[in-house]
């Protein structure tokens, strides 16, 4: 089942030791259910609206470019914030689009050291469109991680 959650702290990532977001469920009632957890995404059903952020257009894989990007994540009690990143590699294969990204945002680096466990699913934005989501941190370099394209996730969901 899916529950609303609050972030209560961060264990900062460092070389060889991925950090993590600490927190817990903020309500006793589930807001949805998970039906499938795959390499292409977690799929389920929501019983209530999941947030107040506006819908965004999805970038075609051909629109994803190397260079500046933004991730949206909640790493403190302040709620969702945008953080600067750079897409450094795009691998298109039969498995779909896979992205490599590096966090460049000073605020995020100061709090988390980069990408930490618990940030999976954080949207990756570029040129006003959602291009994908964070999936993994590179353990030997927490400033760097991987993502999956939104098109790949949507294809898997259909």
Where are these regions (language model features)?
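C-terminal recognition in membrane/secretory proteostasis and scaffolding
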Residues: 1-158
């Amino acid at each position: 089942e899916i529950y609303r959650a609050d972030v209560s702290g961060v264990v900062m990532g460092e070389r060889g030791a991925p950090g993590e977001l600490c927190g817990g469920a903020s309500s006793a009632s589930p807001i949805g259910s998970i039906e499938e957890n795959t390499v292409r995404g977690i799929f389920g059903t929501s019983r209530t609206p999941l947030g107040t952020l506006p819908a965004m257009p999805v970038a075609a894989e051909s629109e994803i470019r190397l260079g500046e990007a933004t991730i949206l994540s909640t790493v403190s009690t302040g709620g969702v914030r945008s953080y600067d990143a750079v897409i450094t590699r795009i691998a298109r294969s039969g498995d779909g689009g896979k992205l490599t990204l590096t966090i460049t945002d000073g605020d995020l680096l100061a709090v988390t050291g980069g990408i930490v466990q618990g940030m999976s699913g954080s949207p990756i934005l570029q040129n006003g469109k959602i291009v994908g989501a964070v999936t993994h941190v590179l353990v030997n370099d927490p400033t760097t991680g991987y993502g999956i394209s939104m098109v790949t996730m949507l294809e898997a969901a259909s």
